[in-house]
């Protein structure tokens, strides 16, 4: 069984250009995922530079399910008074993605299908009934299905679709490559504002810009929106299984716990993608238990064996609406997609680009990153996270072939691989100082506080940290 994303199967990409000199640009976008590339697409005629700390197509978007639908559990979660606005934003986002794919002939396994929202219990039925009212008052057609896979109740809409998100990103990158300056493996570590210019440090070089847009999923500096105090991170696992028939639907449960979609690859092979659980990150650090539960569920319910399994994390705001737009004058952020990165990332790109272009946008106020977002809930969550932070400082862990030890008042992590070779790293996340937990499933060092991930040699895989935890070997 592998722990790689299904979307990377048979993907070959060339090494991207790396920033190695000081440059000046009108608009600098940090983060070349769904939001960054879509924003660049809308602003491509305005002298845009986009940078990414790694390879494009290997960030958070690559570990999504690739469903594009507005029939979401988030329609009821937290955004009281904004349900209609959120629904319409997701419909517009779906249309944005569809238009980009079709008008640019992007080959990304685009397939029209329909979406189910299903109830697993009577309480879920009540939730769906409320969502029906939201759909009705916005003239959105849906159908009721009393028995969907043995569940209590479900509704479906027909104008949704699925894609291979990695191919979509790479298609966007190719489309933009002649109109936008793109740099990969180029890490932004800090920025300043002087003489009406943003000055961003990247790979020990500097980029001057009039506008700065941060679309890194989780902003790389705490000062960018104070996200650790306004949102939290959830983690879940996705299981990939062989499937014998291409089914033309995707589905989620009304409580948001279960997700199903099907994927037909270029060779005609059919897969089923399934996830059944996500929770706050610090509650999900026992990776082996989570994967075993997922394997048990797929075997018990679908009689299928998982061939590949991988995890993903996302930033959740307390009102379940993204923090996207202008944070300060000419400084923009986009984060907090609450599990729906393809649609929320795309509509965030439209909000930001409309603002820079001087256009009105009906979602600007609702998505405003400066709005109040559950301050009390944020304080409560941070008290819980503080407990995790303190316990991470106190405990010595031993997980399979990895353990944490202390030497000269410095904590280290050691992993011994199948060849009996030792891989030693610093056991402290450079972002905010949490100690790391070894993930036996993905063979990575994971941060339980804000989801930074490092490989066994300390190289950074995911942020918000922008520094590695590598221990430099002493020369003999």
Can you annotate each of these PLM segments?
Residues 25-50:
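N-terminal Rossmann-like FAD-binding beta1-loop-alpha1 element of flavoenzymes
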Residues 159, 255, 300-381, 424-425:
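C-terminal catalytic lobe of FAD-dependent flavoproteins
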Residues 68, 104-111, 206-207, 214-330, ...:
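Active-site substrate-recognition segment that forms the wall
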Residues 133-134, 155-211:
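Helical element adjacent to the flavin cofactor pocket in flavoenzyme catalytic cores
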Residues 359-442, 468-476:
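N-terminal pre-ligand scaffold of iron-sulfur
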Residues 81-175:
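Rossmann-like flavin
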Residues 45-63:
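Glycine-rich FAD pyrophosphate-binding loop
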């Amino acid at each position: 069984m592998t722990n790689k994303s299904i979307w990377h199967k048979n993907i070959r990409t060339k090494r991207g250009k790396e920033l190695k000199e000081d440059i000046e640009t009108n608009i600098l976008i940090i983060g070349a995922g769904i939001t960054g590339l879509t924003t660049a697409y809308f602003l491509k005629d305005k002298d845009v530079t986009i940078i990414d700390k790694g390879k494009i197509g290997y960030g958070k978007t690559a570990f999504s399910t690739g469903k594009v639908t507005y029939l979401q559990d988030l329609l009821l979660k937290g955004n009281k008074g904004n349900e209609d606005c959120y629904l319409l934003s997701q419909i517009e986002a779906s249309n944005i993605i569809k238009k980009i794919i079709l008008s640019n002939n992007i080959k990304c396994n685009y397939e029209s299908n329909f979406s189910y929202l299903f109830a697993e219990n009577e309480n879920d039925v009540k939730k769906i009934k409320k969502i029906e009212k939201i759909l009705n008052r916005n003239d959105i057609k849906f159908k009721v299905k009393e028995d969907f896979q043995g569940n209590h109740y479900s509704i479906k809409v027909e104008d949704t679709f699925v894609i291979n998100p990695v191919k979509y990103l790479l298609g966007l990158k190719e489309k933009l490559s002649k109109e936008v300056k793109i740099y990969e493996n180029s890490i932004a570590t800090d920025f300043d504002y002087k003489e009406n210019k943003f000055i961003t440090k990247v790979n020990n070089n500097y980029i001057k810009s009039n506008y700065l847009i941060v679309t890194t999923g989780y902003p790389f500096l705490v000062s960018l929106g104070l996200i650790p105090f306004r949102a939290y991170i959830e983690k879940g696992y996705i299981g990939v299984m062989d499937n014998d028939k291409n089914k033309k639907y995707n589905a989620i449960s009304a409580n948001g716990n279960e997700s199903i979609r099907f994927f037909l690859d270029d060779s005609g092979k059919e897969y089923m993608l399934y996830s059944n659980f996500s929770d706050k990150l610090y509650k999900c650090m026992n990776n082996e238990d989570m994967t075993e539960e997922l394997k048990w569920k797929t075997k018990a319910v679908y009689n299928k064996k998982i061939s590949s399994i991988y995890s993903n994390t996302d930033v959740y705001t307390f009102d379940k609406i993204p923090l996207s737009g202008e944070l300060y004058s000419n400084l923009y952020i986009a984060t907090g997609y609450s599990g729906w990165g393809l649609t929320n990332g795309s509509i965030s790109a439209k909000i930001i680009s409309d603002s820079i272009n001087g256009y009105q946008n009906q979602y600007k106020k609702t998505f405003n990153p400066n709005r109040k977002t559950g301050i009390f809930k944020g304080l409560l969550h941070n008290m819980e996270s503080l407990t995790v932070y303190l316990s991470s400082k106190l405990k010595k862990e031993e997980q399979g072939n990895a353990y944490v030890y202390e030497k000269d008042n410095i904590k280290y992590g050691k992993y011994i691989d199948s060849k009996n070779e030792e891989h030693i790293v610093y056991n402290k996340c450079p972002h905010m100082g949490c100690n790391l937990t070894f993930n036996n499933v993905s063979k990575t060092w994971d941060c339980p506080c804000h989801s930074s991930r490092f490989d066994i040699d300390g190289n950074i895989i995911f942020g918000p940290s922008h520094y590695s935890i590598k221990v430099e070997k002493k020369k003999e």
